[in-house]
């Protein structure tokens, strides 16, 4: 069987030669043939089947074939680019729409409901937490008086914990202060008035039976005020830490600069002392040889200044005349 028969079949070849098809139909037929034989046979063999057609038809088919090849290469390049970039724009749009749909939408009714719940809530402040009482235990004890929302306890500082462990304390976590949110401000106020300065109670074998509550209701105080306060304290702590680090860095730079200056000054002094000793040895070579190690001159610089005689136009008396005048004065006195 010939190549044309393998591509199109013998019957299709006869029909194609006899019938007068339009250009669009010819293009579609060629595209189908090329797509079916693209993986097994080269496209150039298709032209051998059309030997009976005219030269004009062959030229038109060649043009269509070139156009199809260009289109196919462009499609393959775009598909590769889409695979490399992670998908086409349509796929990205679908992903974004899915993510948008997955986000839970809050209606105005829910927003209003949350606002009212926040307005109804009340917060109690505990200035002292019983030793080793965890937030879950605190919630369990106070939940019998009313519905509790959120609980926050401040753990002890690392310095206090380290000191406590050095003194033989327990390794369990201790808390210093805390805040408890009740869903009803009335319940929170009544609980604070009822339990303040009273024993925790419960079973006598309980760890916290003899401890005393120390709590206070905070009027017009909401949970977001607490979060804002904690955020402000953390920001202030970070700023102080940055300032201390910067100050320590400056002190270290100044210390290193002083060390370098001290080394430089020490080197200058050493060179000067060596130079002065050389000058002394050159000025008094005999004396330095005779001196012992204990009586050697010090390394300090010695300078000698020669006194010049007084120059004057007056006739200054000699030493003998001065002595004679002194004797005459003494004779008159005594």
Swiss-Prot record:
Protein name: Pre-rRNA-processing protein esf2
InterPro entries with a match to the protein in the record: ABT1/Esf2, ABT1/ESF2_RRM, Nucleotide-bd_a/b_plait_sf, RBD_domain_sf, RRM_dom
Function: Involved in the small subunit (SSU) processome assembly and function, and in the 18S rRNA synthesis. Required for the early cleavages at sites A0, A1 and A2.
GO MF, one example: RNA binding
Compositionally skewed regions (Acidic residues) per UniProt: 10-25
Biased composition, class Basic and acidic residues, residue ranges: 61-84, 286-297
Gene3D superfamilies: 3.30.70.330
Listed GO CC annotations: nucleolus; nucleus
Residues with PTM Phosphoserine: 22, 51, 53-54, 85, 88
Keyword line: Nucleus, Phosphoprotein, Ribosome biogenesis, RNA-binding, rRNA processing
Record's keyword annotation contains rRNA processing: yes
Chief location of this protein within or outside the cell: nucleus
Cellular compartment(s): Nucleus, Nucleolus
UniProt record similarity statement: Belongs to the ESF2/ABP1 family.
Residue ranges of every copy of the RRM domain listed in the record: 122-212
Region annotation Disordered: where it falls in the sequence: 1-25, 52-98, 275-299
Gene Ontology biological process: endonucleolytic cleavage in 5'-ETS of tricistronic rRNA transcript (SSU-rRNA, 5.8S rRNA, LSU-rRNA); endonucleolytic cleavage in ITS1 to separate SSU-rRNA from 5.8S rRNA and LSU-rRNA from tricistronic rRNA transcript (SSU-rRNA, 5.8S rRNA, LSU-rRNA); endonucleolytic cleavage to generate mature 5'-end of SSU-rRNA from (SSU-rRNA, 5.8S rRNA, LSU-rRNA); small-subunit processome assembly
């Amino acid at each position: 069987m010939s190549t044309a028969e393998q591509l199109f079949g013998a019957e299709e070849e006869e029909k194609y030669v006899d019938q007068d098809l339009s250009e669009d139909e010819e293009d579609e037929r060629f595209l189908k043939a090329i797509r079916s034989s693209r993986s097994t046979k080269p496209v150039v063999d298709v032209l051998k089947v059309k030997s009976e057609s005219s030269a004009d038809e062959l030229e038109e088919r060649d043009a269509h074939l070139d156009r199809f090849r260009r289109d196919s290469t462009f499609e393959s390049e775009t598909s590769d680019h889409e695979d490399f970039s992670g998908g086409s724009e349509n796929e990205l749009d679908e992903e974004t729409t899915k993510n948008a749909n997955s986000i839970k939408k809050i209606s105005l009714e829910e927003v209003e409901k949350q606002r009212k719940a926040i307005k109804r809530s009340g917060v109690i402040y505990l200035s002292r937490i019983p030793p080793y009482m965890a937030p879950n235990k605190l919630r369990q004890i106070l939940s019998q008086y009313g519905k509790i929302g959120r609980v926050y306890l401040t753990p002890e500082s690392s310095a206090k914990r380290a000191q406590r462990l050095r003194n033989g304390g327990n390794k369990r976590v201790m808390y210093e202060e805390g805040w408890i949110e009740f869903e009803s401000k009335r319940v929170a106020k009544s609980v604070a008035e009822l339990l303040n300065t009273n024993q925790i109670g419960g079973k006598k074998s309980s760890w916290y039976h003899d401890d005393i509550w120390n709590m206070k209701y905070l009027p017009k105080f909401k949970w977001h005020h607490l979060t804002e306060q904690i955020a402000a304290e953390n920001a202030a702590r970070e700023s102080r830490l940055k300032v201390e680090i910067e100050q320590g860095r400056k002190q270290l730079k100044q210390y290193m600069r002083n060390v370098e200056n001290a080394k430089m000054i020490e080197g200058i002094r050493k060179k000067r002392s060596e130079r002065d000793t050389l000058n002394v040895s050159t000025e008094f070579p005999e004396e330095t040889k005779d001196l012992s190690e204990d009586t050697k001159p010090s390394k300090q610089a010695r300078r000698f200044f020669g006194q010049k005689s007084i120059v004057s136009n007056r006739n200054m008396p000699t030493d003998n005349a001065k002595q004679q005048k002194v004797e005459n004065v003494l004779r008159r006195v005594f």
